């Protein structure tokens, strides 16, 4: 209820104005969440592809990244990194996207930090 009174604009009538601005606020929040999801998905895909290429050049078949990795945070951004490790929908989408190309992506919860492990069987 407090949120509704904060969002009320004087241009609207009392009841209709509150309802209208609450709906607008919900839409704005939904749009922000969708944009964050898309932005994180694209940045994470690009970052993981770069890491796959680097690991493959060294003859490795997997790599692991910690949630507090400075390079990951710089590449994705703070909000995007948090979204990556806390959004199960985003994790499912990343797993699905990489599975098509033969990569296995696992998100693991640790005691102090989370991890993402990407592995593959054949030489990349």
Predicted segments, located by residue:
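A general, composition-driven signal for non-globular sequence regions
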Residues: 2, 12, 20, 89-91, ...
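A generic structural signal for ordered secondary structure
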Residues: 64-66, 95, 103
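C-terminal edge-of-domain segments
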Residues: 97-124
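A short, charged, amphipathic alpha-helix used as a generic interaction element across diverse proteins
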Residues: 50, 91-96, 100
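An N-terminal amphipathic alpha-helical segment
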Residues: 1-82
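Well-ordered, non-membrane alpha-helical segments in soluble/globular domains
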Residues: 45, 84-94
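Short, charged/polar micro-motifs that form catalytic or ligand-binding hotspots
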Residues: 80-88, 109-111
């Amino acid at each position: 209820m407090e949120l509704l009174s904060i969002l009320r604009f004087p241009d609207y009538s009392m009841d209709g104005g509150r309802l209208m601005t609450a709906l607008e606020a919900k839409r704005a929040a939904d749009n922000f969440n969708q944009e964050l999801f898309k932005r994180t998905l694209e940045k994470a895909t690009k970052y993981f592809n770069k890491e796959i290429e680097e690991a493959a050049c060294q003859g490795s078949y997997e790599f692991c990244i910690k949630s507090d990795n400075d390079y990951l945070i710089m590449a994705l951004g703070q909000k995007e990194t948090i979204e990556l490790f806390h959004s199960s929908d985003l994790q499912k989408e990343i797993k699905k996207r990489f599975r098509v190309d033969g990569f296995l992506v696992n998100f693991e919860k640790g005691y102090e930090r989370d991890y993402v492990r990407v592995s593959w069987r054949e030489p990349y």
